[in-house]
Amino acid sequence: MTTSFADYVAQQDARNTIQLNVRKWTMMLCDALEHNFTEYTVRAHKRSANLADRVEDKAYHEMKIKEAQEKCAVKFTFEEGRKYFKVMFRDSGGSNSVHAFVDRKTGEVYKPASFKAPAKHVRFDLRIIEQREWVLKNCDWAGDYLYMKGWHLKKNFCSLHLSFGFYIGEHV
């Protein structure tokens, strides 16, 4: 089967659109992670302020709540690699860690196996609207949503049978 030049151009335009959308969705993931970290910080300081006995401690926690609401103490960014976008967590001290990998062409999200490589199995596919919305709503800065044994995978994606012989959410 041969493909005409017009078909090739149309397919290339579609691939480029998907790749631009994957970049946009990765930026949205970074924003959602920063928002989650801010909520976590505010919640922790409110809890500590309520438990504090001294006035100085309460004032300190109130100050930290205002700081957290004005500016996030951490930054989630992504670096562009040959095959993946590497979602990076950067704290105020300058330390870096890898939060996730996103395939540049397909939008598949992976948990990191190391600083340089993703884990073998896909966790989410950002091209699928239901999964993308779930990830953006439920992602957390610590990365709990990236574990395969999570209840969310059993609930939403059990019917997805993968080629390596088990369903997402079953024993690994």
Predicted regions, residues:
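Exposed beta-strand-loop-beta-strand "reactive/processing" segments of non-cytosolic proteins
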Residues: 65-100
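A short, surface-exposed interaction/processing loop segment used at functional sites
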Residues: 106-136
